[in-house]
């Protein structure tokens, strides 16, 4: 087997490994339901803006976790268990609010326009962290970063997989209300 074939196999293997590991953990399909429920009061333009910001923030978080996640968590003394607990509490609260929301009579409520600074803050917390790229995604990304050998094809495959997952996040959140 020549070097090109080995690098190609390594690239594809790293892509498939990272993509199939991250996608079910992040689960943007169910995350889109929370997103639509919690942003129902926003205009379509604001919801689109928040979805784009969530994708961007998710990309940044996943890349930082890939390259430096284990160092950062150790530096601050944060365990994955603490992140997992906080993420669970936020998910529980969001689910509880969705279950106890007042019944809608079919008429649409007036849409609100919020300042961009408020939308950015909303996009980061709680949507990006911990709902989208929460403790599970952080732990998995740190594990991927420490498991795969550092070579160009593995790194390229993993980065492309993260980009693909972020694209799925954006698509699900952007068009989740349709």
Question: What are the roles of these predicted feature ranges?
Answer:
Residues 1-24, 101, 108-128:
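Small-residue-enriched transmembrane helix starts and helix-helix packing motifs
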Residues 2-7, 70-79, 141-154, 178:
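Membrane-interface helix termini and inter-helical loops of multi-pass transporters
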Residues 14-31, 80-89, 156-169:
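Structural signature of hydrophobic alpha-helical transmembrane segments
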Residues 14-64:
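Juxtamembrane transmembrane-helix termini in multi-pass membrane transport proteins
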Residues 17-23, 32-38, 125-130, 137-147:
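Generic transmembrane alpha-helix signature in multi-pass membrane proteins
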Residues 34-36, 166-178:
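Transmembrane alpha-helical segments of integral membrane proteins
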Residues 37-48, 81, 115-119, 146-152:
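Juxtamembrane helix-boundary/capping and inter-helix hinge elements in multi-pass membrane proteins
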Residues 48-102:
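Membrane helix-loop-helix hairpins that form the core translocation module of multi-pass transporters
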